[in-house]
Amino acid sequence: MNENILWLHELRLADLARVGGKNSSLGEMIGNLAGLGVSVPGGYATTAEAFKDFIAHNDLSKRIFDRLATLDVEDVNALTLAGKEIRGWVIDAPLQPDLDRDIRSAYAQLCAENGGGDVAVAVRSSATAEDLPDASFAGQQETFLNVTGADDVVHKVKEVFASLYNDRAIAYRVHHGFKHEDVFLSAGVQLMVRSGVGAAGVLFTLDTESGFRDVVFVTSSFGLGEMVVQGAVNPDEFYVYKPTLTAGKPAILRRSLGSKAIRMVYSDVPGERVRTEDTPVELRSTFSISDEDVQELSKQALVIEKHYGRPMDIEWAKDGVSGKLFIVQARPETVKSRSHATQIERFALEAKGAKILAEGRAVGAKIGSGVARVVRSLDDMNRVQAGDVLIADMTDPDWEPVMKRASAIVTNLGGRTCHAAIIARELGVPAVVGSGNATDVLSDGQEVTVSCAEGDTGFIYDGLLPFERTTTDLGNMPPAPLKIMMNVANPERAFDFGQLPNAGIGLARLEMIIAAHIGIHPNALLEYDKQDADVLKKIDAKIAGYGDPVSFYVNRLAEGIATLTASVAPNTVIVRLSDFKSNEYANLIGGSRYEPHEENPMIGFRGASRYVDPSFTKAFALECKAVLKVRNEMGLDNLWVMIPFVRTLEEGRKVIEVLEQNGLKQGENGLKIIMMCELPSNALLADEFLEIFDGFSIGSNDLTQLTLGLDRDSSIVAHLFDERNPAVKKLLSMAIKSARAKGKYVGICGQGPSDHPELAEWLMQEGIESVSLNPDTVVDTWLRLAKLKSEG
């Protein structure tokens, strides 16, 4: 059109200096990716040149830069005063006549091309240094939604111009070495997506916490996307596995149902563009988008990532009328994609017996502690001192000047892609978002410890608790002398642990997934209609979003298994089928009516005996169904199955039959079925058991207690428990030699090699194929065994 206005479809990344990162990226996608299935709403942008002319037209340059030249951005009061003053100058200044005319003319054309009448648009900022790989200006300038009519568009463009001098934008430029006079603004005017009656959110093409590159992380909530971006809602979350998605298979690894308490919608009140309202109760217990939507968004995200050649941070919206999905922003991810994986930092909390005050979604994997500072408004921000723990309902970009002082951040609202989470990652401090009630349960001045080192859930503890911080250098790791695998119980830590050098996961405990992510006895779900009212109430709360009870059990199990299996693919993952004892099953919701009382559950109704017992047959079939889903539907065939506590040869043969009846046929699609070698009978009859199974994984914990005749849960005889006992080592040696002679797999997954490095050395000398260790001992054991091997 002219030097004031450019249409988005005309723009490319090369136009960054003319229209800023956001608008040039939109143009890049419209021009290059529309044919590949990426849908971006159209619109136009004012140019940086037009902004410069506006500033010059009103003689604002000298006034603005003189005002900023002596400003101390660490003085929050002075920063607030300067920002307010400069924004006032900009708002009061008129647009140059040709820019005013061109904005109106372009809006009229946009309306004519989209059905006539005043179309709704979003007016967004796009800074000329914004969204570069080394900067994250996201959210620092203003966005206005559901703007209609030429007069309002013109006014909002000027407000966007003024927002270049928001307090947080001024402070950010100073902190990151950008000269104020080198940053200009473009206003993007883009067609609105009717997500007020649909859904919207943010996605990343990597895991935001670990940096794991093989997933797309999607967040979603009902209504306009601002609620997710701001952190005003706890959204739904989804992890999608890229290789499975690319292969055209169901690819959702994990789902998490958010509370989604409020939503932002279009307002029908004159003068009010949008409003927030309570999300209808019946919608809160459902996922805001379908699995098909999640997969489609992820496909578009992969196209964008491939085109840009780097991990991306993407905002999306679903039109609630047409059902169509749109990409409304895409920018480079600026935190995890720049971190270097040659060093891994680990935090471990000594929290035994500590009082938990609040919990929410963990951001990062660090621990911080300090004095809690409850901030309820911008007026309270000056009270935050260096090292304090910032406690707030939510944060927005106005808070950034003081957020960098905090040792940790805790919010009532928000998910992992909200403002507080993004800034916490940039600052490298732990954050717990979506806690619900932190500002109510934490007292101003109270000493607290914030831990994000325990998985997806972050905890706020009472007091200043001791914790360890270790840094491990992964550079120049020597070749491992044998397969070093990991024991991983919690799928929430899988992506993080997967960054360690490893040959796979040697023990993934299915019962841990049942306990942490299901919490209900499988028979109670199979017999849902027979449960008491109080049990039904608990079950209904757990299964929200999953439809029927049985689907919940199978899908949650499959999600946990798939997450673990994907985290180290294509390396092997050995999933041990459930090994709860009767007392542990009884503690699950609805479990007491299905479990016998046993005097010694440790050697009672557990493992293989359950799988072939009529009382548990249907429940076991659900486990098989989950494994089948992961292997066959999702294509994660690096998954092996392991059977625990096989007492007799006959029991072993029966289990193989039951597995086959449930679709898990030995050898089919490369399926290996191995057994835990954890009873003396297993080692003594190793040759015979290996005729039935594809290999052994030695469970040194149970093997030790059963060989020495002691209860490992008894403190009285605990001092006698030692995997290095000669009797135990003799059985270990028998099992290893039998497996080697038959050319079958043999590894160990018990605690012994993690606790006793010399046992790991002895096992290597005996010819064991793999040792599976606790993740925190992997690197040290790796280096120790490699050194031993090199010394001959």
Spell out what each predicted region is.
Residues 139, 309-334:
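Conserved metal-phosphate-binding beta-hairpin within the catalytic cores
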Residues 137-171, 197-268, 328-361, 405-412, ...:
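Extended active-site and interfacial segments that coordinate phosphate-rich ligands
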Residues 118-122, 127-137, 141-145, 182-186, ...:
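Conserved alpha/beta-domain cores
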